[in-house]
Amino acid sequence: MTRYDEIIMVVDALRRFAGIRRPGFAPRLGRGLLGLLGAGLLFSQTDPAGLARKALDMLLAQNYPQFAALASPQLKDNMNEQAFGKLGAEIKGWGAVEKIGDAVVEEMGPTRVVTIPVYFADRNIRARFAVNPAGQISVMYLMPGEAEWKRPAYSKPDLFTEQAVTFGEDEWKLPGTLAVPKGTGPFPAVLLVQDFGPIDRDDSHGVITKPFRDLSDGLASRGVVVLRYEKRLRQYSGRMTGKPYTADDETVDDAVAALGFLRTQAGVDPKQVYLVGHGLGGYLAPRIAGEDGKLAGLVLMAANERPLEDLMLDELLAAGIKGNDLVVAKAAVARIQGLEQNDADTPAILGLPAVYWLDLKGYNPAAEVKKLSIPILILYGERDFQVPKTDFDLWKSSLAGQKNVTARSYPALNHVFVAGTGPSTEQEYRKPGSHVAPEVVDDIAKFVGK
């Protein structure tokens, strides 16, 4: 899920907050979101991956009777035989099926959502299916597939190895990837902490831009151990959805656990462990450092200095809300700022639980930085349309005179530190070959002593 997706979800939440119904949505097939059919996300006790694969096979074979036998009544109402045939005709234009990838099953509230990559001669897609308790496909939609991630030029895979790891308490165990340089350690190590929302270990923005995978490869090639991991909001989305949670639950607690785990790994110098936080991860990095108490240094990438609600209002404006939606958004920000501790049961505001906002009430990342004596590097791409330059300037002014703090900006880089020209947009995140700029990898490597 990209930050844009999160904003659209928040806009919808604002409409509900104001009692406004969202108009019906029927996207064209063949552009952007290729098809959205059905409704009703519910939990299934059946084998969701097997059921979804069977539905996909029937779609590709254009066998409507057997497809309909797998579908919920709502899906059959939306996907009648005529619509099924039209979709099949469009799919036929994509050429022969060259490969069908493995199914990935996710918890999305009370549902199982199955994603299956399909590679055609002309394009690739992601087919997604939701399965309900009756063992029926209740939602089907086809999305543009991920272009294959290709290593940046600075990635030297012969210089490091990668291994799957798991860490954390039994209730919230998280999978991750540990990149370890070849040779004799001990090596400095970096923990990568992601941006806002249920984002993956690669900090993926769009379908092919994976800044943390770039950083991991680049730093490991330079002799740095790197740990990246799935966020709790992604790994346990079903358990988190609709329940009150805080910034500690979303990010801080797992980052502290990951740091403890990283220090125990073979080849790691436990006294040279650093944290690199992007977006929300950078905003919360000073809190994580305070909780951990052992970090050798911090890198804050595209981190907001202002309160989160102010940043979200800016992003909603950038997403184009106006009129009554804008009035409601501003009212929501005012409500957040007026929350008191006895308001913990207040319904979600701007898409986040009241306890989340209360947890951050009074949190000042620059003030927390001033409590730290460790080296801190603040990085900013001047083409960032998600975190305005206002925040970078505030970091510099708030921390002027702090000898342990270095701030650096890059005129050509965007929010994910990819180079470009002109105003940055969400479309940049979908551009093949988008990688974190080599100068950013170089600056971070030098910061950690490599």
Segments predicted by a language model, with ranges:
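Conserved alpha/beta-hydrolase
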Residues: 214-238
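Short solvent-exposed beta->alpha transition segments
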Residues: 50, 54-57, 61-112
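Accessory cap/linker subdomain of secreted extracellular hydrolases
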Residues: 291, 297-371, 401
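Catalytic active-site module of serine/aspartate enzymes centered on a nucleophile-bearing elbow/loop
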Residues: 416, 422-450
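Alpha/beta-hydrolase active-site loop
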Residues: 244-266
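Short, surface-exposed "cap/lid" segments of acyl-processing enzymes
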Residues: 183-218
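N-terminal cap/lid segment of alpha/beta-hydrolase-fold proteins
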Residues: 147-184
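Short beta-strand/loop motif that positions the catalytic acidic residue
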Residues: 372, 378-380
